[in-house]
């Protein structure tokens, strides 16, 4: 899609802001500031908008091109834990209006500033059956609707730990855009641990295959979980495969408990050096910070990127199928690609009988047998007359 922010990224690196949550924690707010719901950062957009405005302004003064709304958990999934599930659209709208106001105040024709609508992962993982598809879809759709109404320039689905959760959020965002009659760029960011997998075990190629090609996604990347020094190997893999512009927002290192206080030790200078290297060496187009980063970290990054250009990339995304854990390219070194078809109840009497009996272990056993026999992919079909596939 054509959008001024995407066009800007084709000319120079685009800098996002840093952390919201840890900045709020450093403000010594009381329970009264949260309306008696301490820990619900999103409610501050209503109860203490001055605090949120100050944080936004600090990042813009540091040189950020993009600020994120205070809406990371502004969906009914999270708000239900505070008894506020009916306020998702209200809080999303309020956060977007605050960020929009501050961004417009700091914008000029020569240097426009942008607002990103932050959509966090929530607290339920659909791949583990903790929440159903329709319920999660409705929650995200409501959140994004509020952000769009408040005037965000893009929607940022971030800190994703479950590919299915990310896919649901993308679908919800597109539905909300269609309902609003307004399409904006859609960024997707996943989270990898130091071992290079997402929380449920998804590897980088599987994440790219399952998410980067979704309709409407404009940029793909990673944020949170680790500092930049632990992201390099994953980001390098994404740079080789992802056909979309890359975005990276690391933490200020790994958190440490110092005297009972969660502390991030990576200095602004070291943070900027690492992240600027991602831009020039790995071709990252959008860079900023996550937990523990401050306006000082973003100011250092802006200085480090002054005059820099985004490194060239020639990504090659293989045609592949992805599971929750890994991706299998269709072009195998030792051909042919072998497709196991005995996990299809239309073609396997043994599988159909186990399906009818609800024998999950038996069905998995058939799948494992085919894998042991050399199958690269499995043809899974659970459609049976009279059976609820859900």
Predicted regions and their residues:
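Domain-level signal for soluble alpha/beta catalytic cores
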Residues: 1-390
